[in-house]
Amino acid sequence: MIVIGIPGDKRTSGIQQARSDLGMPPAIILSYAEFLQGQSLGDLLEVQKQQLSSQPAVYNGIDLSAAPPLLRLESPGSSFEVERALIALGAPDAVDVDDSLHPYAERPDPRPLRVKVAHQLKEMQGVLHHPSQWFRGYCRMLARLQREAKEVCPGSLWLNDPADIAAMTDKRRAQQILSEAGIPIPRPLGEEQQPTDYASLREMMISRRMHRVFIKLAFGSAASGVIAYQLHPVTGAEVALTTVGVENYITRPPIYYNSGKLRRYTDTATISGIINWIYRHGGYAEQWIPKIGHNGKAFDIRQLVVLREACHAIARVSSTPITNLHLRSQRMSPSEAGLSEFIQEQVRNTALQALAAFPRSGVAGIDVLISGGSQQCFVADVNPFGDLLYDVKYRGCSTYEWEMKVLTARDYITHPSTPLIKEGSS
């Protein structure tokens, strides 16, 4: 297994620990930062192979070195160095401008930063420096990884295909794919044409009689850029619950940041500023579906799917409309949250169908919300890196232990029906 991520972070360390606990040889860990600094995938791989050449490569009698390489991309989100490099890669004067994996490449980024300026960005707690340019750079990095893997690792398999990861990361494209596949999702505000700013959002909410919506930054994570927004159709009064904080300045544009906690806004100036900023970078609005509750609190389910099997699941319980573990939502098992086995089976089936809409990918965390009225399941998000779940077991295994057991060489060599595909075969 070749993991491309951030060496030593919780994800790559969790994978290595799981492999060690199972008696498997360590994975090869390649660094996003070094790749973005200009080193080739081949050079990075050669260095790591030399360091691991003395390690045994046999597991359960299988020579793992004889298996086709399995490429796993991890989240780049825990490193500001990587974030800054991706913003630079997304610059209009960047050298590598392969936008083939960007779902909306033709849409210009607002006030783009040149490469030199991007490299000078300073880390500021929670600040969202340039989300749309970051995403453009991310898609360019994915395209480069895909190209170089074809050359360096012929016959390799992607656990999650880079094109699918790009699509999952952009909520606009992900929800479109799910809808086209017949997967139930919250109804978009403007199915043919999404709003483009605060004014068009309010106009569409009133004309479609959808007075409560969730507005999302298309490529936000950890609840950043999410707004639970209500508009009174008669008085025009409005309320926005969001993690977005604002710092205003006299001589330069405001700074928007993820405050890490929910804030309540009722003044039009602040609300319109936040919403306009989100739509400039890429926004998505959908019907606000009241979630099923437990002891007066709302919850949804993060359901992990690994190679067409729904496994680990956790209920994210909150006293607010926004349920996210980064907001310190209470964690429960679905049973503890009061879900019947029938509803749990519906959640699992919905999650399986959601990942099947991305047939070149094998692992994702699916956020499933259950309507408090009809108890119908809806897919709110498909997270290609949604397997970082602590203290959740399935058949006695943690998430990474389960994935490593399923992804042994024997599994993906002898079961061609799995979503794992050969690099370049799509």
Predicted regions and their residues:
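Short, flexible loop/turn elements at secondary-structure junctions
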Residues: P7-G8, E34, E192, F219, ...
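C-terminal or late-domain output modules
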Residues: A18-L22, S54-P69, A315-F358
